[in-house]
């Protein structure tokens, strides 16, 4: 029973790490990265479809994304979706592919993005602490129901805290790495 609580908490904390990694992937660092387009959805035959399902996204140069639609008739729809997005760059349509040039980041933009990274990292740590609270509550319920002893409860609480500390440290490391990547010129 006690191990089930810890395993469930670990699994949920891992999901928080994965979610954070996805969010960080969407924050650009002045280099082309296919994950910048992960949140773009295109109206394709009346259905909102993720861009990566209707086109291949390649990186021919350090700051250029090349979007090649599988169906050439969707080119205008893709261009419309890219123009409507908040990427801050204009797509260039040459009739068969769309080129997106990722602009170089200004110092001010870098600092703003670093603040955003800190905020996202802080939110991930709050989520991990909420998971810890849920696990602690579950352990206390088991102790109240006499499923575990008071000593087992104390041990379980220490184990949950250790898992939480490890998860928070991992988030701090991820945040620091992303900040460093953003502030690199």
Swiss-Prot record:
Top-rank lineage group of the source organism: Bacteria
Subcellular location(s) of the protein: Cytoplasm
UniProt keyword annotations, A-Z: Cytoplasm, Protein biosynthesis
CDD domains on file: RRF (cd00520)
GO biological process: translational termination
Location (main, coarse): cytoplasm
Function: Responsible for the release of ribosomes from messenger RNA at the termination of protein biosynthesis. May increase the efficiency of translation by recycling ribosomes from one round of translation to another.
Family per record: Belongs to the RRF family.
Annotated protein name in UniProt: Ribosome-recycling factor
Record organism: Streptococcus pneumoniae (strain P1031)
């Amino acid at each position: 029973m006690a191990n089930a609580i810890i395993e469930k908490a670990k699994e949920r904390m891992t999901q928080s790490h994965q979610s954070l990694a996805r969010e960080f992937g969407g924050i650009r660092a002045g280099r082309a990265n296919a994950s910048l387009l992960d949140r773009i959805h295109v109206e394709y035959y009346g259905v909102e479809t993720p861009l990566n399902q209707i086109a291949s996204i390649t990186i021919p140069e350090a700051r250029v994304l090349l979007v090649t639609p599988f169906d050439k008739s969707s080119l205008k729809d893709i261009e419309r979706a890219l123009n409507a997005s908040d990427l801050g760059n204009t797509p260039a349509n040459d009739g068969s592919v769309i080129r997106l040039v990722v602009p170089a980041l200004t110092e001010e933009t870098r600092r703003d993005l670093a603040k955003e990274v800190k905020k996202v990292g802080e939110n991930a740590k709050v989520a991990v602490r909420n998971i810890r609270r849920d696990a602690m509550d579950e352990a206390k319920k088991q102790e109240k129901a006499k499923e575990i002893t008071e000593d087992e409860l104390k041990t379980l609480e220490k184990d949950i805290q250790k898992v939480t500390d490890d998860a928070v440290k991992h988030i701090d490391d991820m945040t620091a790495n992303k900040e460093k990547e953003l502030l690199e010129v």
